[in-house]
Amino acid sequence: MNCLFLFKSKKPRKQQKDNNKNKRKGKELLQNSAPELTNRSETSSFNLQTPRSLPSPRSIKDLYTEREQNLRVFSYEELSKATYVFSRKLVIGEGGFGIVYKGKILSNGDSSDPPLVVAIKKLNRQGLQGHKQWLAEVQFLGVVNHPNVVKLIGYCSEDGETGIERLLVYEYMSNRSLEDHLFPRRSHTLPWKKRLEIMLGAAEGLTYLHDLKVIYRDFKSSNVLLDDQFCPKLSDFGLAREGPDGDNTHVTTARVGTHGYAAPEYVQTGHLRLKSDVYSFGVVLYEIITGRRTIERNKPVAERRLLDWVKEYPADSQRFSMIVDPRLRNNYPAAGARSLAKLADLCLKKNDKERPTMEIVVERLKKIIEESDSEDYPMATTTTKESSQVRRRQVAKPEKQSLRGVSVRG
């Protein structure tokens, strides 16, 4: 990655004119392709600072009217230079509707400032759903502001001779995703406390979305990105949508997302609720407990589906320790792990009305972390023959899985 360089303009005045031209052109293209994005914001700013602090809005609709879309408009040429003409050597993520590159841009468009490392998502021109998701991310991430939601710096929208070009520019997340650390092919193991802290941050991000009456719809370990301090940030908002209004209990929508994480009521009926996200959160809680993916086809039949498998090892049973990630080498608090499994079980209730709100989940996680800090561990090692067999199967090499979406990770 040391080959990255930045193209600096020798004519600052000309560059400023070009930037202003790109800004006007980008806004015009958005007005033509998605007028709902620009009607809610009269200006797109080059300022990369977080939006000004405002009273807590009632919903995301209030944000659309109260805040400007604080986004920078890039030219295609600028982003092409930032990535060495979209070099394959700089690819950090790839999925069905686009590719993510690592690049460097001028900070605030000023060549005198140090370059800014970013993640650039380039939409696949053949992607049927990609353009709609691109618009959704520009619309949503242009106005939200939370430490546990990835920051969108800007976008590019050009219709040129080479065809339609749609790109998004995000802050760069140097520690990739929770998935990359939880299911590694190397020896590194994510410590127990760090797993809890990451899930707490992710829960606070979801709570923020739910306060805005936004349903994330795609919570999974690969969408929880980690910065250089391992602070978690939710990413990929192409599937997010506004929740129900008034007396409505749900919104009905096409069933999309990732198999294994979606709530049963959504899969069966297409009815989407805020607590559909809570279910997905429960799935990831079991992923951090077990160190297993929600679906692993290389396991014995009885163990291929994570949620079916863990039912055989209830949190209150003596056999529970058999499902805890063996890579932790017993360096986790026994009571804390059981409490976390019980919280996951609440999140996974079939009846969504019985699931806790994300606000309650946050409080429970804080309590579990506090109790875990006061508990002595490593816990006693299980030495039964059955436990050894389970653990040997757990450390088997995971199957290679392709990404369904594109994450902003490096």
Curated annotation (Swiss-Prot):
Its EC number is 2.7.11.1. Residues 11-59, 373-410 are annotated as: Disordered. It is found in: Cell membrane. The active site is at D218. Induction: Induced by infection with the bacterial pathogen Pseudomonas syringae pv maculicola strain ES4326. The modification Phosphothreonine is found at T253, T258. One of its GO terms (molecular function) is ATP binding. A lipid is attached at C3 (S-palmitoyl cysteine). One of its GO terms (cellular component) is plasma membrane. Residues 86-369 form the Protein kinase domain. It is a lipid-anchor. Keywords: ATP-binding, Cell membrane, Kinase, Lipoprotein, Membrane, Nucleotide-binding, Palmitate, Phosphoprotein, Plant defense, Serine/threonine-protein kinase, Transferase. The modification Phosphotyrosine is found at Y170, Y266. Belongs to the protein kinase superfamily. Ser/Thr protein kinase family. May be involved in plant defense signaling. This is Probable serine/threonine-protein kinase PBL19. It comes from Arabidopsis thaliana. The gene is PBL19.
